[in-house]
Amino acid sequence: MSDQNNTPAASQDENHIISERREKLAAWRAGGRAFPNDFSRENIAGKLDEIYGEKESQELDATPVEVKVAGRIMLKRVMGKASFMTIQDLSGQIQLYVTRDAVGEDVYADFKHWDIGDIVGAVGTLFKTRTGELSVKCTDIRLLTKSLRPLPDKFHGLTDVEQKYRQRHLDLIMNEQTRFTFVARSRMVQSIRNYMVSHGFLEVETPMMHPIPGGAAAKPFTTHHNALDMELFLRIAPELYLKRLVVGGFEKVFEVNRNFRNEGLSPRHNPEFTMMEFYEAYANYKSLMNFTEGLLRQAAREALGTEVFVYQGRELDLSKPFARLTIVEAIHQFHPGFSIAQLNDEAWLRAKLTDLKAKLRDDAGLGTLQLMLFEETTEAELWEPTFIIDYPAEVSPLARRNDANPEITERFELFIVGREIANGFSELNDPEDQAARFLEQVKAKEAGDEEAMFYDADYIRALEYGLPPTGGCGIGIDRLVMLLTDSPSIRDVILFPQMRTE
């Protein structure tokens, strides 16, 4: 038995392998049949295994099942007049049994020169090997695509993290977990869309290039429109456009799309990321929290089949009601040594934050100081799903003030495994209050805050036509996928994450 092509790239020099494969391609071209596109696949590996994997060998022999499969060669064993190969498609792998007598001498002679990574199409009948493996006994097999570059060694796989991100196509070929992650992502996003539509929401698309960046506190990317000779900004959030639609009478809208923020890279941050934002007239932040819980449970069921799963070695249960705590309540719960009186004392908060080496602004008020202490000491502790509610007005320029206490807003952020997953609030629909808060943001920007918002006069004009009482929420799709696929880094769940140029 020969080990010819038994593993993807062995110890040979890669350039030599590529040269040999180019020679094979040249010979294939000379035959006038290179890269055909007339093979029609009728079966996929995973479905065949699902239907026939448990059937007995005698049953398959008694009632032959003809199949047409196609995929990439991942393993090949040539044994004289009979050979085995394993091919892979998105659904899984299946073994092919190829003999000279069944496919003919010419085809078998060509077959022996095919390489790991080549893509083939095969016709045959299902059978079970002596070890019980479901296989295809080929009556015809064709080379469909020649692979010129060798795949990584199957025993070591693609282990270089940078290479995985830069060559995602190779990562998808070699790593089943990567394929699972992105299939799960697709299913999750589709389930979110279905959930929104089933609750009466209309999916819309809003501009990706804005004359004024708005809807979030973030530094934007800039670009220039040549024909209009104007500076534009890649959107940091779709919020202000979506709320314009609510003004226009679209009472329940949502959008799944990209945002761009010219900020740092981290396991939780990528400058280009996906958000789902939704807005509902005659709703408030309390009803939105209930809705968001239901949406996340549905996403988990669709992606994983369960609401209880393990993330990074710890169990997480989305089936239980999510906790709801104010900023001060959360700090005190996880750090009972900090008294409620201390947490409401500006001088104590400043001293504590100084000890923690936090960057303090002179104009930071009580609410900002409490939020900073929460972020420094408590945010990472919120493993179980927890809504942090009633954010200070000074850090929530688009949120409605609380009627009982105008220093806070009707706003929440949802944290799971110590990460912000969602941010929502009762929308500020008072145009005069919104204008005043925009002016405060302008002052902050002039004082050096690059993430402070611009004054958006056109949005104020839209509010002056009347925005009904409205609730809105944004959910980070990438972070949610991280959660549901047990992925430690946001780069693991973005097909082509931003990378530094090689």
Swiss-Prot record:
* InterPro entries documented for this protein: Aa-tRNA-synt_II (IPR004364), aa-tRNA-synth_II (IPR006195), aa-tRNA-synth_II/BPL/LPL (IPR045864), Lys-tRNA-ligase_II (IPR002313), Lys-tRNA-ligase_II_N (IPR044136), Lys-tRNA-synth_II_C (IPR018149), NA-bd_OB-fold (IPR012340), NA-bd_OB_tRNA (IPR004365)
Name the needed cofactors. Mg(2+)
Q: Which residues bind Mg(2+) 2?
A: 420
- Taxonomically, the superkingdom here is Bacteria
* A molecular function GO annotation: lysine-tRNA ligase activity
Give the E.C. number(s): 6.1.1.6
Tell me what this protein is called. Answer: Lysine--tRNA ligase
Origin species, per record, is Aromatoleum aromaticum (strain DSM 19018 / LMG 30748 / EbN1) (Azoarcus sp. (strain EbN1))
Gene from which the chain derives? lysS
